[in-house]
Amino acid sequence: MNFLQVAQEVIDGKIISNEEALAILNSKDDELLQLMDGAFAIRRHYYGKKVKLNMIMNAKSGYCPEDCGYCSQSSKSTAPIEKYPFITKEEILAGAKRAFDNKIGTYCIVASGRGPTRKDVNVVSEAVVEIKEKYGLKVCACLGLLKEEQAQQLKEAGVDRYNHNLNTSERHHSFITTSHTYEDRVNTVEIVKKHGISPCSGAIIGMKETKEDVVNIARALHQLDADSIPVNFLNAIDGTKLEGTKDLNPRYCLKVLALFRYINPTKEIRISGGREINLGCLQPLGLYAANSIFVGDYLTTAGQEANSDYRMLEDLGFEIELTQKQEAAFC
């Protein structure tokens, strides 16, 4: 398979077939650089060499009634994590200031649970109004399953993006969780879109899914028209259903990132949780397919130090995408 030729066809508007998608995942390691070259051709065409930086604020940790097999915050998990209720508006604002000062363009307010309470949405909404005024950051909320009126309130407050991952294929979903359905997740993304909030939805790779499942989730996100697609790689935490699962290697992770770029050529592809332990020394290559990363810690696991990420981007010759207020402050 000539990956560079397929990449050009994708740029010209082609949608790759399932056979071509599986050929990417099944490609030989000797073909990896050609595959990434093709992925970079697509990425460069739509995004140049800019990289979007994102930071997570874990606004509520633990106490989740859901049974997601990958999650240390699940009701079924025995992982020894820090647990706390929804944080204050002032704490959210303090995190936004850290994001601004560290050249993070998108600030992600994330909370555990099936869905937010009225109070949760009020706190986030009040914080977002001030964040937009003081720092001009793009704000992404990730609060669980969302109702129509909650989506409308978040939109009016200024929330730019809402994250609700599909996580895996429809076929594999019941293996990961039984406390909510695949359709529940799709419906939340559709509600977000209906109310004019940019949809963010992605996947977790390495949860005992097949390669066909990986292709199906990448294609489902294309059909859902998610603007931003976080690609997580399982960090199997002790105490969760998937503890001890080690199905990934760095080369396969790169093939997955390339696949998501070939199937979703115009979208923001973000290398997300688990990149440090699963991509290892090959992390920099991931940005030849992806154009976005998380900086700092994740929800209950540590990330790479921010200075290491900035150095990686500088070594690659990539440029951090700043907000208008950051450009005024730092340029």
From Swiss-Prot:
It comes from Lysinibacillus sphaericus (strain C3-41). Its EC number is 2.8.1.6. This is Biotin synthase. PANTHER family: BIOTIN SYNTHASE, BIOTIN SYNTHASE, MITOCHONDRIAL. Belongs to the radical SAM superfamily. Biotin synthase family. Keywords: 2Fe-2S, 4Fe-4S, Biotin biosynthesis, Iron, Iron-sulfur, Metal-binding, S-adenosyl-L-methionine, Transferase. It is an enzyme of class 2 (transferase). It catalyses: (4R,5S)-dethiobiotin + (sulfur carrier)-SH + 2 reduced [2Fe-2S]-[ferredoxin] + 2 S-adenosyl-L-methionine = (sulfur carrier)-H + biotin + 2 5'-deoxyadenosine + 2 L-methionine + 2 oxidized [2Fe-2S]-[ferredoxin]. Its cofactor is [4Fe-4S] cluster; [2Fe-2S] cluster. It comes from the Bacteria. Residues 46-275 form the Radical SAM core domain. The gene is bioB. GO terms for molecular function: 2 iron, 2 sulfur cluster binding; 4 iron, 4 sulfur cluster binding; biotin synthase activity; iron ion binding. Homodimer. InterPro entries: Aldolase_TIM, BATS_dom, Biotin_synth/BioAB, Biotin_synthase, Elp3/MiaA/NifB-like_rSAM, rSAM. Pfam families: BATS, Radical_SAM. GO terms for biological process: biotin biosynthetic process. [2Fe-2S] cluster binds at C108, C140, C200, R270. Catalyzes the conversion of dethiobiotin (DTB) to biotin by the insertion of a sulfur atom into dethiobiotin via a radical-based mechanism. SMART domains: BATS, Elp3. Binds 1 [4Fe-4S] cluster. The cluster is coordinated with 3 cysteines and an exchangeable S-adenosyl-L-methionine. Binds 1 [2Fe-2S] cluster. The cluster is coordinated with 3 cysteines and 1 arginine. Pathway: Cofactor biosynthesis; biotin biosynthesis; biotin from 7,8-diaminononanoate: step 2/2. [4Fe-4S] cluster binds at C64, C68, C71. CDD domains: Radical_SAM.
